[in-house]
Amino acid sequence: MIIKEILAELETKDHPVAKPLYKKEGIKILMLGFKKGMILKEHKAHVPTKLVVLEGKVIYKSEAVEIELEKYDEFEIPVNDLHAVNATEDTVCMLIQG
């Protein structure tokens, strides 16, 4: 029920909501929810990470690339790449780390 929890929390939040879906040694799966216009501020991924858009649309932006990702798109986030994610629609994403 993680995605439902995220969607419920988004009703009262002004920032993206993240919750772990799965965690085991060497791998972690996080679910992220955004309302349209929300921004995940600049940060770095310190381990290999894949961003998968399950619903909605986001813009992944770093110094090296700016790419629009929509439903079912996936993107390999380079390790230590300073980036931000901007939701252009209400969005649910999955982050696979490890």
Where on the chain are the PLM-derived regions?
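Conserved short histidine dyad/triad with adjacent acidic residue
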Residues: H15, K28-A45, V79
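Glycine- and acidic-residue-biased ligand/ion/polar-headgroup-sensing regions
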Residues: V47-V58, E63
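Short acidic-glycine-tyrosine-enriched beta hairpin
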Residues: A64-V79
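A cytosolic small-molecule/anion-sensing beta-strand core signal
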Residues: L54-E55, E70-K71, E89
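Ligand-binding loop in jelly-roll beta-barrel domains
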Residues: V79-G98
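A short, compositionally biased micro-patch
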Residues: K24, K35, H46, V53, ...
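A short, N-terminal "cap"/entry segment at the start of jelly-roll beta-barrel domains
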Residues: M1-G26, K61
